[in-house]
Amino acid sequence: MIIGGKKFDVEHETYVMGILNVTPDSFSDGGKYNGMEQAMEHARQMVEDGADIIDVGGESTRPGHIMITDEEEIARVTPIIEKLKKEFDVPISIDTYKSKVAEAAVQAGADLVNDIWGLKYDEKIADVIAKHNVACCLMHNRDNTEYSNFLDDFMEDMRECIRLAKAAGIADDKIILDPGVGFGKTYEMNLEIIDKLEIMQKLNYPILLGTSRKSVIGLTLDLPVDQREEGTLVTTVYGVQKGSAFVRVHDVKKNKRAIQMTKALMRDHEV
């Protein structure tokens, strides 16, 4: 898989997508990096720590978040994307579900569109992705948590995302799938989809797992958002074992090391 001119061996490796929220209200790090210098300094640290992709978000998607206008989101993300592209040789992802924001971000240099609605919120976003031939990550999401059979319905929802992508002309080798931990699911469903992550391999697309500091970890360990790193690392290790090609995380260094150790244990050993 090629993203931003870089080759990703999604069959054998697990890559780290570092989170860069330039928002005042994201659940974990809102307000910490919404100034240009703070954002760039954090990006430098993530690249130094081994981030394979930087994911830029201009609107919080936490529960109860306040929606902002396309123009406001564009004003937040495009300057940082332009600066990141000038300074780093690392692919840049834009975390948005809005076609106008995606268009502006790709024109600013974004190499991947990370859509938390899997092309279902804004029908024009698929056309933007196809037109520019950039990669996309399609996340599972729903307005409610009512399922007839959770795993069956989940898989059908993912197939619908794929159908939308293909109908717009997005190439197979540009698609990544995300199970959407923390979105449109109960606590037990979130645990279940992490545990059964390997079922997504039947869809034959690379998997991105995003669990970093999420409520499923907080509820399990009864910990606030700033104390969920160990829980995140466990889900990263589990995800690697289940076939994740990417993990989206806040702490790049720790997750990179956890992946490296897990891969060493999983490979064939010459004894």
Where are these regions (language model features)?
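N-terminal amphipathic alpha-helix/helix-capping segment at the start of soluble metabolic enzymes
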Residues: M1-P24, K166-I170, K263-V271
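Active-site-adjacent loop and "lid" segments of alpha/beta metabolic enzymes
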Residues: I3, S28-E37, E41-H42, T61-K83, ...
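Conserved hydrophobic/aromatic pocket- or pore-lining residues that grip, position, or stack substrates
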Residues: L20, G50, V113
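Catalytic domains of carbohydrate-active enzymes, especially glycoside hydrolases
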Residues: E41-G57
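Phosphate/pyrophosphate-binding loops at sites that engage ATP/ADP/AMP, CoA/4′-phosphopantetheine
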Residues: V47-E48, C161-K174
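Conserved Motif II region of HX4D acyltransferases
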Residues: G180
